[in-house]
């Protein structure tokens, strides 16, 4: 039977998005580039097969799933495995299959803790177990779109912007600065244009992911700020310490005077 894990709080042990993808890809020998690709449920099914051999009907798992009803079927297989091994976790299938970053990132954070609590270190050949199948490309990778951030960030947004550098190595391996220069004597303008367009699309996806991650962490910081404001009259030293951390700035940082330029314009 499985060891249940109930903690869902954010701790220093939580992996970043980049580290989480690296762990999944290394453990299962996959090539996932986005947390959202976990919405198919296939990776979780194989992790369960790794932890508890025979708990999952792995042959029924659709690693090439591209449609929502296929994702749901995979999660049903996962739920059956959870029930068989006595795992109490309720899987939010309706949210996960929508492919939203926040929902999938929160669930995989829990699953990583569950995995660590149950993994015994035994050898496992993931490619042979799934008979060489690879996961399907996420639908959003086919027609990428560059979205602008939905909310302006205040001075407290400095903290959530720090994870920005974590995504640079998650681009698809096909794109690279040296791709266009391969076989210069043979290639033509159309091929080079196609390669450049592919690189642009990858960069757009990277920016989109970074904006989602920034907004995700900003939302958490904003919720913490609201809780502190609601209880600021209690003179709680812990709350005050949290507020100090929220509003702390890097050494030497100066908040710009937004009124300065307007006043100068009025004088002229």
Swiss-Prot record:
Q: How does it assemble?
A: Homodimer. Heterodimer with MAPRE3. Interacts with DCTN1, DCTN2, TERF1 and dynein intermediate chain. Interaction with DIAPH1 and DIAPH2. Interacts (via C-terminal residues 206-211) with APC (via C-terminal residues 2674-2845); the interaction inhibits association with and bundling of F-actin. Interacts with CLASP2, DST, KIF2C and STIM1; probably required for their targeting to the growing microtubule plus ends. Interacts with MTUS2; interaction is direct and probably targets MTUS2 to microtubules.
The record's region (Interaction with CDK5RAP2) falls at 185-268
Keyword check for Cell division, yes or no: yes
Cited PANTHER family: MICROTUBULE-ASSOCIATED PROTEIN RP/EB FAMILY MEMBER (PTHR10623)
Limits of the EB1 C-terminal domain: 185-255
**Keyword Ubl conjugation: yes or no?**
no
Instruction: Please give the residue positions where the record annotates the modification N6-crotonyllysine.
Output: 66
> Which segments show compositional bias classed as Polar residues?
163-172
Q: Could you give one GO CC term from the UniProt record?
A: Golgi apparatus
| Region annotation DCTN1-binding: where it falls in the sequence | 208-268
Organism per entry? Bos taurus
Extent of Low complexity compositional bias: 147-160
Q: Which CDD domains match?
A: CH_SF
General function of this protein: Plus-end tracking protein (+TIP) that binds to the plus-end of microtubules and regulates the dynamics of the microtubule cytoskeleton. Recruits other +TIP proteins to microtubules by binding to a conserved Ser-X-Leu-Pro (SXLP) motif in their polypeptide chains. Promotes cytoplasmic microtubule nucleation and elongation. Involved in mitotic spindle positioning by stabilizing microtubules and promoting dynamic connection between astral microtubules and the cortex during mitotic chromosome segregation.
Q: Where is this region: APC-binding?
A: 220-242
- Give residues where Phosphoserine occurs: 155
Explain the post-translational modification: Acetylation at Lys-220 by KAT2B/PCAF promotes dynamic kinetochore-microtubule interactions in early mitosis.
Molecular function (GO) terms for this protein are: microtubule plus-end binding
Which stretches are transmembrane? none
Q: Per the record, what about its domains?
A: Composed of two functionally independent domains. The N-terminal domain forms a hydrophobic cleft involved in microtubule binding and the C-terminal is involved in the formation of mutually exclusive complexes with APC and DCTN1.
GO term, biological process aspect, one? negative regulation of microtubule polymerization
Name of the protein in its database record: Microtubule-associated protein RP/EB family member 1
What family is this? Belongs to the MAPRE family.
Which residue stretches belong to region Interaction with APC? Answer: 206-211
N-acetylalanine occurs at 2
């Amino acid at each position: 039977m499985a060891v249940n894990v109930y903690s869902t709080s954010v701790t220093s042990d939580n992996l970043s998005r980049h580290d989480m993808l690296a762990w999944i890809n290394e453990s299962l020998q996959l090539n996932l580039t986005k947390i959202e690709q976990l919405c198919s449920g296939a990776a979780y099914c194989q992790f369960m097969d790794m932890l508890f051999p025979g708990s999952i009907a792995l042959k029924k798992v659709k690693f090439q799933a591209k449609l929502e009803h296929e994702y749901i079927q995979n999660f049903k297989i996962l739920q059956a495995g959870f029930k068989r091994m006595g795992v109490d976790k309720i899987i939010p299938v309706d949210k996960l299959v929508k492919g939203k970053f926040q929902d999938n990132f929160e669930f995989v954070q829990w699953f990583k803790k569950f995995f660590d609590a149950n993994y015994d270190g035994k050898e496992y050949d993931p490619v042979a177990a799934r008979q060489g199948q690879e996961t399907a490309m996420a639908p959003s990778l086919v027609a990428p779109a560059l979205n602008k951030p939905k909310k302006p960030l205040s001075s407290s947004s400095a903290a959530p912007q720090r994870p920005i550098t974590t995504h640079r190595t998650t681009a698809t391996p096909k794109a690279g600065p040296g791709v266009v220069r391969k076989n210069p004597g043979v290639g033509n303008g159309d091929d080079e244009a196609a390669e450049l367009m592919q690189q642009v699309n990858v960069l757009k996806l990277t920016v989109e992911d970074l904006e989602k991650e920034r907004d995700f962490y900003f939302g958490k910081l904003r919720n913490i700020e609201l809780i502190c404001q609601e209880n600021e009259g209690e003179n709680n030293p812990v709350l005050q310490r949290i507020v100090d951390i929220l509003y702390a700035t890097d050494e030497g940082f100066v908040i710009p005077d937004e009124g300065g330029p307007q006043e100068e314009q009025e004088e002229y």
